[in-house]
Amino acid sequence: MFHFLYEIERGNKMIKGTELFVKALKAEGVDTLFAYPGGQAVDLFDALYDEHEIEMILPRHEQALIHAADGYARSTGKVGVCLVTSGPGATNLVTGIATANYDSVPLVCFTGQVPLGLMGNDAVQE
């Protein structure tokens, strides 16, 4: 989670990476986010909590999430945007990403990641 805690100075205000993520989503016109929370993405969920311009859809499983985002993109013509945690959260998206890819459906998927120091140590999730 530490990589979302970096702050940059913008004028006299420090801006967290999570705030920049939310600002980037808004700048790209994202108004709906399909998401499933988990430890490695919890900081992003905290930043999105008070954001009322982006509707968050929280299904009960990542596979439902990716297929819902696919259906959303097909029915609205907008990009389906997803946010999940690392490990199984990410791998549960694979079939839905492949389905969307075969039909040229636009999806953007974000996943959490374990801290850099834990990579390569079988730490795929919390």
Across the structure, where does each feature detected by a protein language model lie?
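N-terminal alpha/beta PP-like core and its mobile active-site loop of ThDP/TPP-dependent enzymes
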Residues: 8-126
